[in-house]
Amino acid sequence: MIFDKDDFKAYDADLWNAIAKEEERQQNNIELIASENVVSKAVMAAQGSILTNKYAEGYPGRRYYGGTDVVDVVETLAIERAKEIFGAKFANVQPHSGSQANCAAYMSLIEPGDTVMGMDLASGGHLTHGAPVSFSGQTYNFVSYSVDPETELLDFDAILKQAQEVKPKLIVAGASAYSQIIDFSKFREIADAVGAKLMVDMAHIAGLVAAGLHPSPVPYAHITTTTTHKTLRGPRGGLILTNDEELAKKINSAIFPGIQGGPLEHVVAAKAVSFKEVLDPAFKEYAANVIKNSKAMADVFLQDPDFRIISGGTENHLFLVDVTKVVENGKVAQNLLDEVNITLNKNSIPYETLSPFKTSGIRIGAAAITARGFGEEESRKVAELIIKTLKNSENEAVLEEVRSAVKELTDAFPLYED
């Protein structure tokens, strides 16, 4: 049978050669994309398990198909661990992605056409926080709030004033490119003052929240969403949390049958594994090291007058750098660094003047290199290599030196131990 090949790599050589090349790329590249991480072998094993064969529409104890006793155990493990991690009363582990988690949260809290306040994309928000190209901006009347133009920090007085003017039904807090601590209690105060609900998307900082290194939004938000990858170091997927039983029912209905059919139980299993890893004391050490490494890299840029750190520094796993004094734009910087095996992404900065396809900045994250074992010394070295590359973009001899230095670092810290 074609479905029972023992030597599956030989059977589909084109595919497996591509996967092998990606494994080689990840091993030999320094990964600084803030939304990426390195999962454990246990997470990959669960995601590649026989659970992928099972369809299980519904929820534990309330399925539409038979033969779901085992997947009920798996999903319940994931649910209970998520609740324990974040101190939430209810958790839905079925969202296929963070965007779908956000979609379900909106469906549970507001109606199409309602006014919503979300963070401006250039200030650090996410596409699903009201960008016109996103379902969120097309379904709801989003009004964006921005950071202060001088400090590049959230200005809660300005946000309150704006909320009083636009009278939103919902305020969305959370970001994909904001390097400072977010005070969720102040967002809740603003929401209460104008009669709005509060939703928090903590996708980027969930691992730091889980480790107690960033204030948790769960006590303040009516609904909290997150991805399960990024700083949580789990599989790609979504998670929704709430302490409100009625909202939990709405969330469950919004996910299934609202926007999804059967859950991906093999991914739910991988989430369960990663949640167990998060509950291990070693995860707190990992999360603390992520912040240390992020700060170590940022400090190198702060000492160079040719670069500017947005908001003046970082208190989490990422930061933005304005590179326009050194190279034309963020896209040029991203491409140059790709050539020396350092991977990051171009990123808009507050009050951006360039298109999102070029940008003035780059975004640098420490989650993946920390997972590999990089410490503060190696992180500083990485920042120095970035600066060296961008300032010597036409000097092939210097670029080759950078490639060699990158290879030394990646060889010293393998992606996975054999």
Swiss-Prot record:
One of its GO terms (biological process) is glycine biosynthetic process from serine. It comes from the Bacteria. Its EC number is 2.1.2.1. One of its GO terms (cellular component) is cytosol. Pathway: One-carbon metabolism; tetrahydrofolate interconversion; Amino-acid biosynthesis; glycine biosynthesis; glycine from L-serine: step 1/1. The keyword Membrane does not apply. (6S)-5,6,7,8-tetrahydrofolate binds at residues 121, 125-127, 246, 355-357. The modification N6-(pyridoxal phosphate)lysine is found at residue 230. Its cofactor is pyridoxal 5'-phosphate. Catalyzes the reversible interconversion of serine and glycine with tetrahydrofolate (THF) serving as the one-carbon carrier. This reaction serves as the major source of one-carbon groups required for the biosynthesis of purines, thymidylate, methionine, and other important biomolecules. Also exhibits THF-independent aldolase activity toward beta-hydroxyamino acids, producing glycine and aldehydes, via a retro-aldol mechanism. NCBIfam families: PRK00011.1. Belongs to the SHMT family. This is Serine hydroxymethyltransferase. It comes from Streptococcus pneumoniae (strain Taiwan19F-14). The gene is glyA.
